[in-house]
């Protein structure tokens, strides 16, 4: 695969994943959230003691941007804010029942995508792909 093919595939993959996630949200009963809000839910679902600062760092957006998203998600019933008993200045974010449901559906989409990618690959092919993905991941991490 030459440079242009790799570049074209990467560009297409990044764009398609975002579009497909957005379309699948619009076609579900969760049409009231955006893909950016879904990614916020995803971060909260991954970290049991998520805070607004943690979400901001994970999504690489400002705290103001996260706060706006959190306000919307709380109003829509996807998350709740709970103050720490030890330090009342600390606010933890938790998914509500509705938030946990959409988070599970989103994880299911990603699981199906990964399974489809590796289906039929030999161990050596998986290893080579893993090396390429590790290089891509590290490149993106270094840009942060």
Which residues fall in each region the model found?
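N-terminal leader segment of winged-helix/HTH proteins
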Residues: 1-31
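Terminal interaction helix/tail motif
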Residues: 6, 13, 108-144
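A specific heptad-register position in long alpha-helical coiled-coils used by two-component signaling proteins
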Residues: 11, 15-18, 71, 100, ...
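Regular, well-ordered alpha-helical segments
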Residues: 15, 19-22, 75, 119, ...
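N-terminal helix-turn-helix DNA-binding core of bacterial DNA-binding proteins
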Residues: 22-62
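Short, locally clustered residues in the helix-turn-helix/winged-helix DNA-binding domain
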Residues: 42-46, 107, 134
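Charged, amphipathic alpha-helical coiled-coil/dimerization segments
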Residues: 72-128
């Amino acid at each position: 695969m030459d440079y242009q093919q790799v570049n074209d595939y990467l560009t297409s993959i990044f764009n398609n994943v975002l579009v497909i996630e957005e379309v699948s949200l619009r076609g579900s009963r969760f049409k009231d959230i955006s893909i950016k809000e879904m990614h916020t839910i995803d971060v909260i679902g991954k970290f049991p003691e998520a805070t607004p600062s943690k979400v901001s760092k994970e999504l690489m957006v400002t705290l103001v941007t996260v706060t706006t998203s959190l306000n919307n998600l709380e109003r829509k019933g996807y998350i709740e804010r709970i103050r720490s008993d030890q330090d009342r200045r600390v606010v933890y974010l938790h998914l509500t029942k509705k938030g946990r449901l959409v988070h599970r559906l989103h994880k299911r989409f990603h699981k199906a995508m990964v399974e489809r990618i590796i289906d039929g690959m030999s161990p050596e092919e998986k290893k080579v792909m893993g090396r390429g993905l590790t290089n891509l991941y590290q490149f993106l991490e270094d840009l942060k």
